[in-house]
Amino acid sequence: MRHRFAFFAVLAALVLTAAGCAGDASSGQAAAPATTAAAPGPTTAPPTTHTETTRHAPEGLVPTGRREPAPGLRVTAFDGREIDLARWKGQPVVVNFFESWCVVCRAEQDALTEVSRRFEDQVRFVGVSNNDTVSEGRKYQREFEIHYPLANDSSGRTWAAWGVPYQPVTVVVDQRGRIAWRFDGGLEPGQLDPVLEYVVEV
């Protein structure tokens, strides 16, 4: 009887020991909480900045919405060429009303010749006299080395149509055949350049 009691006591001790080991093993194998890297927040691109360069219109330039169509201009150049303003539509045109004997016209001519060479690939130029003869016109053209055509309006109709009471008068016609700028009197050096730069670009 004593041996049977001892047997059960040993068996119970073994069972308790096994249960304790199992508990230790279970708690020892518990997984550590997973550590996940925080997802990066959405990156915001820096705002795009747009820089607008506003070119200020030169003094006297007519706003595009208020420009009037230029009168017709059909004249014969001193070299025999027929000049028709309508054929030049699509390009800006400078029309200079002058006389070869006019002191103010002669004073502005060097500056006018210079700007005409600067813009010769972008802008057409023509000079229109009122009463110069062919020989006078050609002499004036050679004297100032003018490469653009000069013509004579002996009838005075062109000057009248353009409202030119005296010389010199310079008119800039835009690509659509409208009057963009007009100056009555002698041009100063550099005065016409910003006008043409604006008309060509806008």
Regions found by a protein language model. Give the residues of each.
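N-terminal "domain-start" segment that seeds a small globular fold
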Residues: 50-85
